């Protein structure tokens, strides 16, 4: 299943925002998800809070990340999140496989 590194910018680090974020991500960490997150979403690592800015990070796997839109947009509407960046990531076996592929291919003339 595809894995994603998720960076989420928080509205701020006020007590109300932080409590909402801690509750939401704490529940997700314990396997409790809101009704509008798909059942195949699995938190793999994190969450972590940035020391430099109002941001949290976590890694999850999901078959179709577009299915997280409603749950994320709801947190934006509730004033917890500002924006996010989802980065599709590859495990190290995948990186080795890609390196082997690059090393073995023939350069074609343009």
Residues of each region from the PLM?
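Generic structural signal for alpha-helix starts
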Residues: 38, 77-78
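Short S/T/G/P-rich N-terminal loop/turn motif that feeds into the first structured element of a domain
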Residues: 1-55, 63-70, 90-110
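Short, aromatic/basic amphipathic alpha-helical patches
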Residues: 71-75
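Conserved short beta-strand edge segments in small beta-sheet-based binding/regulatory domains
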Residues: 78-93
């Amino acid at each position: 299943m595809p894995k994603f590194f998720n960076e989420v910018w928080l509205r701020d680090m006020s007590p109300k925002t932080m409590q909402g974020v801690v509750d939401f991500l704490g529940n997700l960490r314990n396997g409790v998800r809101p009704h509008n997150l798909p059942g195949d979403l699995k938190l793999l690592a994190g969450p972590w809070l940035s020391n430099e800015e109002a941001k949290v990070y976590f890694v999850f796997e999901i078959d179709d990340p577009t299915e997280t839109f409603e749950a994320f947009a709801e947190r934006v509407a509730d004033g917890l999140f500002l924006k996010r960046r989802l980065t599709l990531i590859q495990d190290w076996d995948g990186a080795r496989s890609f390196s082997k592929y690059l090393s073995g291919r023939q350069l074609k003339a343009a």
